Structure formats: structure tokens, C-alpha cells
């Protein structure tokens, strides 16, 4: 075995046995430093003949490259090993159960909880969720919903208008979630069964009104939808939402531009105590509006009212949350008060289901 082969084996064995970066650095200096073993061999190239320099010089340079690569590889291996050891030392078992303790501060806002509850109920009936933009055109917010220009019903909405654009058109903060009905009819073919939860905006603010509030509405479109179907859907919803076995409802004639006939729906309840109890008592409370979709709205959605018909309903999420969970002031929903959230909020992992209980 030649001198260079012996030196190569010795250096590679020492490098492989190095336990830390300090040992690796000492080996590098001993082999490749100014007075290292390989550096000393390179100094002898000047005393060699051209033929010897061509053969032996090439072998010395090859040895230098091999040792340099081995040192770099060992440094990288030691660094990877150190990272792996640290990761193992600092591992957190994410499979541990959530501990119920005073440190558990996060709560689900009641509005988010109500949306999840309503989604669970209507999802069980075969409805899907639809969404749309908060900033709407005048067409989708009013005209397509049978509010023509100058219609007196437009005065019922204290609307937030944006400045006119270059074409003179003013966009609005939507005053209801109904524009999504038109957008859905334009994009999908019947049968349609959707609910539309979302934010809406009107210029109003007191204990029971807010400039920004939440609504949910539903829409059913097919060839045979009728008032009896609508009544059944709403009764089943109220029983599930208020978690009672039976509800008594009354439908009062009303007026909405986008439905005909239109109804306001009251539910029987007991208001004699501090908490409203549903499914019993002799009192009545209005909870939503509904009706059969107006033929003009169907036409605006691209459907033939001689072939299709449907029904729709809408209710305020904030209002039904207040009724169900006994919250006295709507403005508290938006105050970001941690104490209020601790009292009225919900545990993050308690997802509402019909099987497990909506508000358990």
C-alpha cells in the first residue's frame, strides 16, 4: 500500500470518528492547514520532475479533494444530528387531549355558534351554503329584487351608498343577503336549496339594532315548491333550533317586494320570566319573514316563472341569538369585551350537531 493510500485511509477514518465540530476542525487543520500533512505533500511538487509532477501531483490533489469533501460531509452530518436531537428533546405530543382549565381562554362568538347551528340544521335537510359580496351594485341589491328605480319600498332601507364611479353608478353596502339569491339563480340550474348567512348594513343603532348586523335567509326553487313546503321547513327549523319537541307558529300577511304572497311569522312562547321559553305559553314573538318568490325576481335570475316557483325566508342572526341565549343588548356583540365573551361564548371544540345537541 502506498504512502498516499495509507494517509487517505487514516484521515477518512479519523474524520468518520469525529464526534463534534471541534474535532473536525482539528482534523482539517492537521490535514489541510498551513503545516498539514497534505499541504506538506503539495510543497514537494516543486522538487519533482515534470513527469513525476504529472502523476504524483494529480494523486495528491485528488487526495486533497477527497479529504475536503469528507470533512464537509461530516460537518453536515453532525449538524443534522444536532437538529434531530434538539427536535426529539423539544417534541410536543399534539395528541394530548385539551385540558379544561382557567388558562383555556378562547371562546367561539355567539354569532359564529348560531351560524354553525343553522348550518347543521339545514344541512341535514339537504341545503347548501351560498355566499356573495358585501359591496353590491344597485342592480343586485334593489332592481333585480323587484325594487325598481323610485319604488317607495327603497325608502325602507337606510342604505350606505358609496361615491359614484366614473359611469355615475353608486355601489352600496348590501342591506340584506337577498342579492345572493339572484347570483345563485344566474349561476345554477334548479332545483336550488340554499341558505345564505352573512353581514348586512343599514344606518341604524340602538339596543336592538346595529349599523352592521347578520342575517341568514333561505331559498328553494323547483317546479313544485309551495307554501305548505315552506311552512314545514320553517317549523322543523324552529323545533331543532330552539330545541323543543313542538312549536306553534302563525303566518300573518305582510309585504316584501321580492315575495308574493308574503308573510311574517310569529312563534308561540312564554315571556313571563326573564328568559323567553319557546314551545309553551300564550305569548307570540315575531322571528322571521318569508313568502313565495316574486315572478319578477325569478325573471331577473334568468328563470321562467311559468315553469319554476320557489319560496324564501330571512331572519336576523343577532336577534335569534339574543332570544335563544338571553342576551339583552345587541351592541355587546361588537364590543370585544372578554368578560362578555367568557360568559356567552362557546368552547372551540363543541361543534353543534343535531345528534350531539346544538348548544350542549
Curated annotation (Swiss-Prot):
User: Which NCBIfam families does the UniProt entry name for this protein?
Assistant: pheS
Cite the Gene3D superfamilies for this sequence. Answer: Bira Bifunctional Protein, Domain 2 (3.30.930.10)
Q: What would be one Gene Ontology cellular-component term for the protein?
A: cytoplasm
What this protein needs as a cofactor is: Mg(2+)
Organism annotation = Sinorhizobium fredii (strain NBRC 101917 / NGR234)
Q: What is this protein called?
A: Phenylalanine--tRNA ligase alpha subunit
Q: Does the keyword Cytoplasm apply?
A: yes
Q: Where in the cell is it found?
A: Cytoplasm
> Which residues are listed for Mg(2+) binding in this entry?
260
User: What is the similarity comment for this entry?
Assistant: Belongs to the class-II aminoacyl-tRNA synthetase family. Phe-tRNA synthetase alpha subunit type 1 subfamily.
Signal peptide boundaries: none
